Amino acid sequence: MLTIDDAKPHDLTAAYNAELAAEHVEAVSPWLSAERFSRALGDVHDRGYAVIESVMAKDELDAYRDILNTHMAQSPTGRNVFEGTKSHRLYALLAKSPLFANMIQHPLAMAFAEHFLGPTCLLSACLSINLHPGETVQPWHTDDGHITVPQPHGIFGISVFWALDDTNEANGATEILPYSHRWDSHEIEGRLDNAHFAQRDDLDGSVEENAAAVKATMPAGSVMIMRSDVWHRGGANHTDQDRMIVTPQYCAGWARPLESMLLAVPPEKAASLPQRTQELLGYSIHTPFMGYVDGMHPSRVLQ
């Protein structure tokens, strides 16, 4: 896999707000120097993704895992090929525990999301994905396919993948097609279609290996940042161990989120969350006044 140091530098000055860009450099400094942050931004913009290793400590990972294991024990496995019939997916994570606010508004995630999407970006989805032994690959897909603008197009979303376990070629590391945001979507063989959402067991998500694919291997505690228009898929788990990630996904402030966050997280729970997380849920305004409630700022609902 290419490293951040291989990437071309990217202008750290976000077009929307140079002052905010400087704040990002300071915010990510515990993990990335200004130069490495610049190169990571270049990675995401140009080839579509960047991996930053060993961001979270073991005690943080264990806390998330304990919460998720409790809820997975009470939930069914995936309903179709896309979700994975040998996978557990949990949605609406902020409704399950406020601890996930720390992950959702982590300085690294915010720096990339705000750089590419602007400060009015929203949380589009936040789910955990636990691949059990024997899980097969997903169909190729993008995370912004619901926005029906032909590829190639600009960056409408940023997807973040937090590795709670070591992810490797054997246990289902996410497979990515670098630079595929530049392609015409019709070039992708084995891409997602409506049949993959059917609750049937006669469909197989497996397709032949794509020679252009890269497997995003990384140790536990690492994070991958990816453009939402990059073609990718969950890998197959050929081991006897689970592989778990949590993926918060962000969209531009004008876009409809994949999960209806204002319904997924009840107002009484949202009211106790940090302000930045509330804004990401939709208790915020996209310039000049998109998102108002009865002519007023939506955050008033929580007061």
Identify the role of each PLM range:
Residues 2-4, 12, 25, 183-225, ...:
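Conserved double-stranded beta-helix
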Residues 2-47, 52-151:
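Non-heme Fe(II)-dependent double-stranded beta-helix
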Residues 49-51, 139, 159-163, 176, ...:
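Conserved hydrophobic/aromatic beta-strand scaffold that supports enzyme active sites
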Residues 57-58, 128-131, 145, 167-169, ...:
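Short, solvent-exposed loop/turn segments at secondary-structure junctions
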Residues 112, 146-151, 161-165, 211-214, ...:
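Short helix-to-loop capping/linker segments positioned immediately adjacent to catalytic or ligand/cofactor-binding
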Residues 116, 150-169, 217-220, 225, ...:
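Short, conserved beta-strand element in jelly-roll/cupin
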Residues 119, 133, 146-154, 163-173, ...:
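Active-site region of the double-stranded beta-helix
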Residues 136-143, 150-151, 170-176, 185-189, ...:
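A short secondary-structure junction signal
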